[in-house]
């Protein structure tokens, strides 16, 4: 009788152990996520700013960020980097937060992510504050996420794709950036 009971307990343990392991609380740490503050500066007049802003506000980043979108008008934009910087400097009072760092004007403000497109000049770029900076290969991936939509003149969709892709990299620990 004792042997039978021991076999039954052992069998029951073997049957239930996968369930116990599956239900056991994991020590894996959950990473907090943050929804961005968003501003849209549609200088080219190609966006549905309200709808785009609403979509971007639902993204989840690993750090608190201010997500700024800028469209640059004109077919003569030869250097988008310069155009975005010029806009940031000349429109400082028009933006929700300063885009250029007040402590060091050679850098973008901390917590800032800028997604920019010059539709008529076929230029796209993304820019990051020092504390949310990503590797250049990730910048390329973020920009590439929008290319097919931009080819179709889906500016809102392309910018949402860039935003979604940026959530994959922004705030990721440096040791994980290549993943």
Regions found by a protein language model. Give the residues of each.
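A structural boundary signal for the start of the first folded domain, especially the loop/turn
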Residues: 1-114, 119-179
């Amino acid at each position: 009788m004792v042997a039978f009971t021991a076999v039954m307990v052992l069998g029951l343990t073997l049957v239930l152990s996968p369930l116990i392991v599956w239900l056991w609380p994991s020590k894996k740490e959950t990473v907090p996520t943050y929804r961005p503050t968003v501003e849209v500066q549609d200088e080219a007049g190609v966006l549905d700013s309200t709808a785009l802003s609403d979509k971007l506000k639902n993204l989840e980043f690993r750090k608190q960020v201010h997500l700024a979108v800028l469209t640059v008008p004109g077919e003569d934009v030869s250097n988008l980097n310069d155009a975005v910087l010029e806009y940031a400097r000349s429109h400082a009072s028009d933006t929700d937060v300063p885009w250029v760092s007040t402590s060091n004007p050679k850098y973008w403000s901390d917590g800032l992510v800028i997604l920019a497109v010059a539709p008529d000049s076929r230029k796209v770029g993304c820019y990051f504050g020092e504390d949310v900076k990503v590797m250049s290969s990730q910048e390329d991936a973020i920009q590439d996420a929008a290319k097919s939509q931009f080819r179709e003149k889906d500016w809102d969709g392309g910018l949402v794709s860039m935003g979604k892709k940026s959530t994959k990299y922004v705030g990721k620990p440096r040791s994980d950036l290549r993943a």
